[in-house]
């Protein structure tokens, strides 16, 4: 597992990987996105998880608000989703809301928090982060299944044992080992640790929290197999609420 990272090497890894990574396009209809956001709000309510009031703003309420809302826009807070370019959100996709985040170029905040919804057997593909360390927390609902590999020197899947901590308890797994997080359990994922996750079949959708160092989804996701990330959107109806990728078009 990586323990230190050379800044210059990281910079070129970001550039090279993202040029390749962005070749795969995710495309989703706005009507599908609206439906997913509405159903997510209903699930958050059932789980008694409260979002900030601005999560429910209509698109027109954002007009001309950049100066007062730059902490939201610049730090990419808000609604976010992807089908990773597979055009089958229920099989391979993720919807989330970034509640707080820093921006190394614009503020001093060194941490981030997300809340995510993971459906039964809905996969977030195998990936690691060069820079970010994170805790993934099962906040309630079903069980979260996580598959783990160390990365090797060439950023492939290593066959070495995987050492992780779950709620402060050290555990050692075989390469490709699986952990199941029940509600209340969490895992710490260090930089360079490959992971994929999905909701366990038959247990219901999962409310998943993430607490981490500053999050940058434009340059700090190293997927084992290249995927799409921010979807191109077919505007078949008006947005109910904006995605983080919509801000530049509305503010």
PLM regions: where:
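A short beta-loop-beta micro-motif enriched in histidine and acidic residues
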Residues: 104-112, 124-135, 139-140
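Short acidic-glycine-tyrosine-enriched beta hairpin
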Residues: 157-191
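A short, N-terminal "cap"/entry segment at the start of jelly-roll beta-barrel domains
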Residues: 12, 16-112, 239-246
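Conserved metal-binding segment of the jelly-roll/cupin
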Residues: 179-201, 208-213
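Double-stranded beta-helix
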Residues: 29, 153-171, 198-251
């Amino acid at each position: 597992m990586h323990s230190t990272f050379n800044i210059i090497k990281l910079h070129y890894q970001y550039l090279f990987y993202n040029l390749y990574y962005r070749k795969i396009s995710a495309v989703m209809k706005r009507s599908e996105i609206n439906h997913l956001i509405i159903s997510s709000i209903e699930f958050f309510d059932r789980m008694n998880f409260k979002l900030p009031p601005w999560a429910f703003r209509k698109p027109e309420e954002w007009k001309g608000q950049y100066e007062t809302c730059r902490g939201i826009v610049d730090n990419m807070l808000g609604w976010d989703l992807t089908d990773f370019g597979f055009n089958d959100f229920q099989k391979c996709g993720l919807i989330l809301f970034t509640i707080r985040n820093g921006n190394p170029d614009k503020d001093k905040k060194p941490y981030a928090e997300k809340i995510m919804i993971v459906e039964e057997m809905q996969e977030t593909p195998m990936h690691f982060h060069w820079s970010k360390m994170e805790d993934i927390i099962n906040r309630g609902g079903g069980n979260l299944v996580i598959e783990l590999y160390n990365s090797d020197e060439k950023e492939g899947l290593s066959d070495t044992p995987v050492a992780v901590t779950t709620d402060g308890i050290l555990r050692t797994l075989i390469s490709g080992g699986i952990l199941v997080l029940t509600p209340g359990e969490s895992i710490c994922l260090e930089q360079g640790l490959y992971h994929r996750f999905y909701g366990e079949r038959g247990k219901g959708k999962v409310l998943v929290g993430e607490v981490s160092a500053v999050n940058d989804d434009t340059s700090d996701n190293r997927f084992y197999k290249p995927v799409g990330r921010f979807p191109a959107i077919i505007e078949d109806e008006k947005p109910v609420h904006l995605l983080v990728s919509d801000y530049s078009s509305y503010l």
